């Protein structure tokens, strides 16, 4: 199986599993790791310190910041928001960003917000909305 990358995407990563499709206007940083048989929909950003398992679907408009870990068979709905810094300051970065883990088989509904460090989202759990 081959990897499919839309010509309007900017994909620098070399660790992408077979059967994965990356659609238009995506940006994938060089050190990101993406498993096999994933579907990365349009307008997704994936930073360097992101690990995505196998058979993962990430719908349009999602940004995966450093520290996000997504296990196998996960669905991330459109426009889901992740954060990796509780006290963001422009140009003042922590030595290491906090991790957010989405466990195998979990689903995050469209527009969901995950504040890090989130408790790992349990296996086969559906997250509709997280409120602050």
Map each language-model feature to its residues:
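Short Cys/His-rich zinc-binding micro-motifs
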Residues: 10
């Amino acid at each position: 199986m081959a990897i499919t990358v839309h010509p309007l995407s900017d994909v620098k990563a070399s660790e992408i599993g077979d059967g994965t499709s990356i659609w238009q206007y995506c940006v994938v940083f060089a050190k990101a790791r993406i498993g096999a048989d994933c579907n990365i929909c349009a307008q997704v950003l994936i930073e360097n310190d992101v690990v995505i398992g196998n058979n993962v679907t990430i719908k349009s408009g999602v940004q995966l910041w450093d520290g996000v870990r997504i296990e196998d068979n996960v669905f991330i709905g459109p426009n889901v928001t992740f954060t990796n810094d509780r006290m963001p300051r422009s140009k003042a970065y922590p030595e290491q960003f906090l991790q957010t883990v989405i466990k195998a088989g979990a689903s995050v509904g469209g527009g969901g917000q995950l504040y890090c460090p989130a408790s790992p989202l349990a296996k086969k759990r559906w997250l509709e909305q997280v409120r602050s």
